[in-house]
């Protein structure tokens, strides 16, 4: 098992990519503490995975929740090797012309950047001492939208670019005892939601025609399941793999970037035209 003996904490582990990470990490021998906002999802994880998982129900947008997660993890499992920030929200490609004005725009900006950037900073701040003592790793979930345009609207894209900057700065500051990296997925089947300030909190990525769009945009021709991205997290969390990597962002985007802007937009427009429901500006979404 690639993670035997490793102790991991993760924010946002109750569904989608986060749940896939937790499930795989336990299968690889890790013990995992999870911060999850939904009591129902937390209880479901415990039923499925048993004593190798410790759950904290809380809101990752609070720095106190991150601190409580780390304390719970160390109290239960004795130490902490790896911290994973996986909280996020997608803006469903809401373009600048579609964004609200004034107070609502300010609220949307605050919500997206708090979830997509600040929650990761809170977890890094809370966990860095224990992870440093373990010569461990911090891993964030970035997005293909943090590497190139077209994976979201300006709020989401800017937040994911900010997260990439945070990865690199933390890697610089915490070396040589902590490796800080990120995985930047492309689209996937997930129940990732939108910001409430944009009225998108009840809408999930799974409810968009993402599969049809992504199969045309990606050179690989298929929309991955969340579990297909988890190998990268396992490698980055391992004590023996990826030991030379820090400040890196793994672009596991199915080749979105090499497709080219013109070809991607043509495929996206064609798929949306054939669907009765689509993202507001036809973006495909990311991790």
Regions found by a protein language model. Give the residues of each.
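Conserved mid-core segment of classical short-chain dehydrogenase/reductases
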Residues: 67, 89-110, 152-155, 265
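C-terminal substrate-recognition "lid" of short-chain dehydrogenase/reductases
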Residues: 2, 121, 130, 222-251, ...
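Active-site helix of classical SDR
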Residues: 124, 159, 167
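Short, small/polar-rich loop/turn modules that mediate ligand/substrate recognition or access, typified
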Residues: 135, 175-179, 241-246
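Short C-terminal tail/terminal secondary-structure segment
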Residues: 90-96, 240-287
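Catalytic Tyr-X3-Lys loop
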Residues: 100-121, 139, 156, 163
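Residue(s) in the substrate-gating loop at a strand-loop-helix junction
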Residues: 143
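Conserved glycine-rich cofactor-binding loop
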Residues: 7, 12-15
């Amino acid at each position: 098992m690639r993670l035997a003996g490793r102790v991991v904490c993760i924010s946002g582990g109750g569904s989608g990519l986060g749940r896939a990470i937790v499930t795989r990490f336990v299968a690889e021998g890790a013990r995992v503490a999870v911060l999850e906002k939904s009591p129902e999802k937390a209880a479901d994880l415990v039923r499925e995975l048993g004593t190798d998982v410790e759950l904290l129900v809380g809101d990752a947008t609070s720095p106190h929740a991150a601190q409580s997660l780390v304390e719970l993890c160390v109290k239960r499992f004795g130490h902490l090797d790896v911290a994973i920030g996986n909280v996020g929200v997608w803006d469903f490609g809401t373009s600048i012309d579609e964004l609200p004005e004034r107070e609502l725009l300010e609220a949307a900006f605050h919500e997206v950047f708090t979830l997509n950037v600040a929650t990761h900073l809170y977890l890094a701040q809370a966990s860095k001492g224990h992870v440093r003592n373990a010569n461990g790793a911090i891993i964030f979930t970035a997005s293909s939208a943090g590497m190139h345009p077209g994976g979201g609207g300006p709020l989401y894209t800017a937040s994911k670019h900010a997260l990439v900057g945070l990865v690199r700065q933390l890697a610089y500051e915490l070396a040589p005892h902590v490796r800080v990296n990120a995985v930047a997925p492309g689209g996937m089947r997930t129940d990732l939601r939108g910001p409430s300030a944009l009225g998108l909190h009840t809408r999930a990525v799974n409810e968009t025609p993402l599969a049809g769009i992504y199969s045309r945009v990606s050179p690989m021709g298929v929309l991955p399941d969340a579990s297909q991205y988890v190998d990268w997290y396992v490698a980055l969390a391992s004590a023996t793999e990826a030991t030379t990597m820090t400040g890196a962002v793994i672009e596991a985007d199915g080749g979105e970037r090499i497709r080219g802007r013109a070809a991607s937009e043509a495929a996206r427009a064609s798929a949306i035209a054939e669907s009765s429901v689509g993202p507001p500006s036809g973006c495909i979404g990311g991790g």
